[in-house]
């Protein structure tokens, strides 16, 4: 599922305030999330610089703006308290559920696995 998450105040280029994020794992009190960002918010230079660690997941079912296409920022994966997870919408207009397809989830998980595998095989991990 995709949630509206309050990332709070952060440092530098970390995500902060409210953003959509894909929950890839949940425990009792925390969730492991991959922040999502709109395609239209980024320049071709940003895309080129981050092409090894972003996933173009396209349109996501349930977004209030059906034309919104997204990138999953797998290099910004983080654990957050489940208290930071919020539903999308409001009491007046109603809440809506945003979900990625199985294919989109697989693309994100495959990219995370690829990043981890490449780190290990290139000898970039200290013994």
Residue locations for each model-derived region?
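Short coil-to-beta transition motif at edge beta-strands of beta-rich domains
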Residues: 1-9
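C-terminal terminal-subdomain/extension
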Residues: 47-127
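A mature extracytoplasmic/lumenal domain signature
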Residues: 9, 35-37, 78
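Polar low-complexity intrinsically disordered regions
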Residues: 10-12, 127
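Short beta-strand or tight-loop elements
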Residues: 3, 17-19, 70
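Compact nucleic-acid interaction/catalytic patches
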Residues: 13-61
């Amino acid at each position: 599922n995709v949630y509206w998450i309050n990332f709070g105040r952060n440092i530098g280029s970390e995500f902060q305030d409210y953003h959509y994020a894909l929950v890839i794992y949940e425990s009792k009190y925390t969730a492991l999330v991959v922040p999502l960002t709109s395609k239209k918010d980024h320049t071709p230079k940003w895309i080129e610089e981050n092409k090894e660690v972003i996933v173009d997941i396209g349109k996501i079912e349930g977004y209030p703006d059906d034309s919104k296409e997204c990138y999953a920022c797998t290099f910004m994966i983080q654990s957050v308290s489940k208290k930071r997870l919020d539903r999308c919408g409001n009491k007046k207009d109603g809440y809506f559920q945003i979900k990625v397809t199985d294919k989109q989830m697989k693309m994100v998980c495959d990219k995370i696995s690829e990043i981890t595998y490449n780190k290990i095989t290139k000898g970039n991990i200290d013994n």
